[in-house]
Amino acid sequence: MDVDAAVVKRIALWVYETCSVFNLFYCITLSLAIKTSKNNALPATYIYNMAISNALLVIFGIMVYILPYYMSDKTYKTYRDSIGAMISVGVTFNYLHPMLTLILMTINRIAVVVSMQASQLFTSSKIWLYTSFHMTANFACLIIPYLSECRINYDIRKVGFISECAPDRHQITTFSNYYSVFFPFVAFFFNVLVIINFKLQRSPTYTKIKNMFRRGNGDQFTSMPSDVLKAKKKTERMLMIQAFITAFYLSVYELTSLVLRVVPELFGNLSLDGKLAFTYFRLAQVPCHVFLVYFIFTPVTRKIYMDFVRERVFCMKPAKKKTIKVSATTTSTKK
């Protein structure tokens, strides 16, 4: 039986719309939940960066991919000519921001593996500083082509980003398009190495070799109170898992981009409805990585989020902790 591409396109669009609304709500409420949380062990700065950029990505995605679907060709042309290039910059910026933040998270993990003292270089204020650096670089790489004659403008009717000086493109656009696809793969590779290192730490031989390289640098942490050291290691493990899942998820998405780049006829031979269906299904998975990482794979943030939604959104009383009553028993002995 032949599959109707138009029906598949409508299903794909519905899936993308549903994922967009759900993840916009989740990212906003997650940010509020983390802000009101008293858990100081959370990597809050990374969570804010991922959640806020993801919420903005959803908003720009609605403007670029969803609203034009319901417009007439004439209305869409006016819409695209007026703000199309601007919102194309917005959607690209917020798509690249989690990738760059992932690179920072990976560097953080590697630095702590090399030396626990490196955690001093990744305090909350310093992470905000580092993210502001890559945000500035990201914005510069997008605004320079935008101000040139080769600015990029997404066209939903052609299902692609179109250069206004086509077939040419700005050198920065060409460079970023070629290399940005490898960001999640590189991060995934190094996060796998970090996980291997984490598993090898159970080996006494590996620990001895590692301590030889850290000789003279471990006094600060061996003298730490055990509860502080335990909390620090718990935070590091949480970050490792989050970085790995994020890298894996984004790598899966970028893998399809790499395949389409190597074999472009796979996409080019599809009908317009087929191209839109494929695009909407791909887009639907992009905003889900925050929910996947911080709700599915991170029990701590999941509990914080559920408590926040229960109390602040549904105005329910906080869940009571179960207490076990111990009754005192007396024994009598016969004399």
Curated annotation (Swiss-Prot):
Q: Where in the cell is it found?
A: Membrane
Q: Which UniProt keywords apply?
A: Membrane, Transmembrane, Transmembrane helix
InterPro entries to which the protein is assigned, alphabetical: 7TM_GPCR_serpentine_rcpt_Srxa
Q: Which GO terms describe its cellular component?
A: membrane
Cytoplasmic compartment segments: 32-46, 104-126, 199-238, 298-319
How the protein sits in the membrane?
Multi-pass membrane protein
Could you list which ranges are Extracellular topological domains?
1-10, 68-82, 148-177, 260-276
Membrane-spanning parts = 11-31, 47-67, 83-103, 127-147, 178-198, 239-259, 277-297
Record-linked Gene3D superfamilies: Rhodopsin 7-helix transmembrane proteins
**Homology family:** Belongs to the nematode receptor-like protein srxa family.
Name this protein carries in UniProt: Serpentine receptor class XA 10
Q: Which species is listed as the source?
A: Caenorhabditis elegans
